[in-house]
């Protein structure tokens, strides 16, 4: 990463303050002035992307994240935020490979695992969803969202009793039997 001078560091902090105050346009303006001097500064690009996301300027946010990742491809924060951008817009097909890249870098991100399972489910990839959820539940056996996606997916695969088992575990449904009932 580039070393910045103290004047640029002050400008960066000023831009961060504007971003914290939700004055995203002013923050973008200052971050862009920093990029004039340091055109390949990933933190400035990343923060611009965050500001554009908050302003609902998705294409601009995407461009900033992609440029940031082109400079610093290992930035897990930028990878996850780009995936989140696509996910929040329902662009599951675009989000999925980025989420998978994130999990290759760090596989214990429970939220990223959940979102990956949801993307697979929403893309109607039942076999991939089944394999992914089975593996993910080994790592996160108490995760109710994973159990829900796995249960719904098993119903899609016509594995009704197994699917209902996972859905019951995730929702805490009451099961009634002929002679007794139990709360799970």
Role assignments for model-derived ranges:
Residues 9, 43, 77, 111, ...:
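Start-of-helix register in tetratricopeptide repeats
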